Regions:
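Terminal targeting signals and extreme-terminal segments of soluble enzymes
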Residues: 1-84, 90-150, 192
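Short amphipathic alpha-helix that is part of the acyltransferase structural core
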Residues: 38, 146-179, 186-191, 195-200
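Conserved beta-strand in the GNAT
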Residues: 114, 193, 200-215, 222-229
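A short, internal acetyl-CoA/4′-phosphopantetheine-binding micro-motif in the GNAT/acyltransferase core
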Residues: 118-121, 228-235
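Conserved acetyl-CoA-binding loop-helix of GNAT-fold acetyltransferases
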Residues: 230, 236-249
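Conserved GNAT acetyl-CoA-binding A-motif
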Residues: 244, 251-264
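Conserved beta-strand-loop-alpha-helix junction that forms the acyl-donor binding cleft
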Residues: 260-269, 284-287
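C-terminal "cap" of GNAT-fold acetyltransferases
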Residues: 284-297
C-alpha cells in the first residue's frame, strides 16, 4: 500500500510546536516523541470527525488497541519548530483499522508512520468486527464529507437534546444550579443543535425573541443569543462558530439589526472572533464574571 507523502494526500492535520522537553542532547526531537505526536494527533482525528471518542466506543461495546506502529525518519525537527501531523485512514478490515501518517515542517517531509489498530472487546481484549457505523464514518470523513449538521427548531423539536447537553456543560461541568439552567425563555426561543453523523448532539445555543430598541435615529430590532454549550471534548473544533453563524442568520432573516449576549469572561476571545464587541463593564451572573457583547447585523 502506497504511503501518502504530500500534504495534499491528507484531509486531516494537527499542528503543534516542539517543546524544550522533547529535544535530546543532539538538540533535535528525541526519536520516540514522533510516535507520541502521531498518537496525540489521533485524538484530534476523532474530534475532526465530531466523535466523543470514549462515550461512543462505550456505546459500541469496543475500543481500538495498537497492534503495530512503525516510523520512518527523513529529517529532524528542532526546538520551536511548528509541525503539522497528518493522518489518513487507508484501510478498514474486518477487525482492523490502518492509518498512515506524516509529519511536515512547512512542505518538508520529516517522518512517516503506519499505525495498525485492532477493534476489540475491552473486557477480554479479543478482536471483534468493526461496527458498520464506525466503518461508514471513516469512509465519509476521508471522502471529504461534512461530519456535522446544524438543526434549528423550537423547544418541542430540539429541547430534549439541547437540555441534555446544556445540563452536562452548565450543571455538571461548570456547577450552575439545575433549577436555573432551564427557564421561561426556552419556550419562545429558536434553538440550534449541532449533530454528528451518529445523531449525537455536540453543540447548542438559543436565540431569544426580538426586542425593539430606540436609537438616536430610528428604532431597531435587537435579540439575544445565550446558552451556548459545546461538548467538552469537541471544543476548539469550530462547532461553537457553526451554532453562532446559524443563530445570527436566523436573527438577520427576521429583521434583527443587533445581536447581544452575556459572555463569560473566559470566552471573550471566542466571541470577539465572531465579530462581537465588548460593551460596559464585567458583572457577576450566578457567581461567574460576564460581560455584555454586541454585534450589528
Amino acid at each position: 500500500m502506497n504511503q501518502p507523502t504530500t500534504r495534499r494526500d491528507f484531509r486531516f492535520s494537527s499542528r503543534l510546536r516542539v517543546r524544550w522537553a522533547e529535544v535530546d542532547m543532539q538538540k533535535i526531537v528525541f526519536n520516540a516523541h514522533y510516535l507520541m505526536y502521531f498518537d496525540t494527533a489521533i485524538a484530534d482525528y476523532w474530534r475532526a470527525m465530531a466523535i466523543p471518542y470514549e462515550e461512543t466506543m462505550h456505546q459500541w461495546g469496543g475500543d481500538l488497541y495498537v497492534k503495530k506502529a512503525s516510523v520512518e525518519y527523513f529529517a529532524s525537527a528542532r526546538y520551536e519548530d511548528q509541525l503539522d501531523v497528518m493522518l489518513k485512514c487507508v484501510k478498514v478490515g474486518n477487525s482492523s483499522v490502518v492509518f498512515h501518517g506524516a509529519i511536515f515542517r512547512a512542505d518538508q517531509l520529516l517522518v512517516t508512520c503506519e499505525l495498525v489498530y485492532v477493534y476489540a472487546n475491552p473486557a477480554t481484549q479479543t478482536s471483534q468486527p468493526v461496527p458498520v457505523e464506525f466503518r461508514e464514518l471513516l469512509t465519509a470523513f476521508e471522502a471529504g464529507e461534512p461530519m456535522t449538521s446544524v438543526k434549528t427548531g423550537d423547544v418541542h423539536t430540539l429541547g430534549a437534546d439541547a437540555f441534555a447537553l446544556r445540563e452536562e456543560v452548565f450543571v455538571n461541568e461548570q456547577g450552575f444550579a439545575l433549577e436555573i439552567e432551564q427557564d421561561a425563555y426556552d419556550a419562545t426561543s429558536v434553538h440550534a443543535v449541532a449533530y454528528n453523523r451518529l445523531a449525537q448532539p455536540v453543540a447548542t445555543g438559543r436565540l431569544l425573541p426580538s426586542k425593539e430598541l430606540q436609537t438616536p435615529s430610528d428604532p431597531i430590532k435587537s435579540s439575544k443569543i445565550g446558552r451556548m454549550a459545546v461538548h467538552r471534548v469537541m471544543r476548539g473544533s469550530k462547532l461553537g462558530r457553526d451554532i453562532m453563524n446559524t443563530l445570527m442568520a436566523a436573527a438577520k432573516s427576521r429583521g434583527d439589526a443587533e445581536i447581544v449576549l452575556h459572555a463569560q469572561c473566559s470566552a471573550i476571545n471566542f466571541y470577539a472572533k465572531q465579530g462581537f464587541t465588548e460593551r460596559g463593564l464585567p458583572f457577576d451572573e450566578e457567581g461567574v464574571l460576564h460581560i455584555e457583547m454586541f454585534k450589528l447585523l
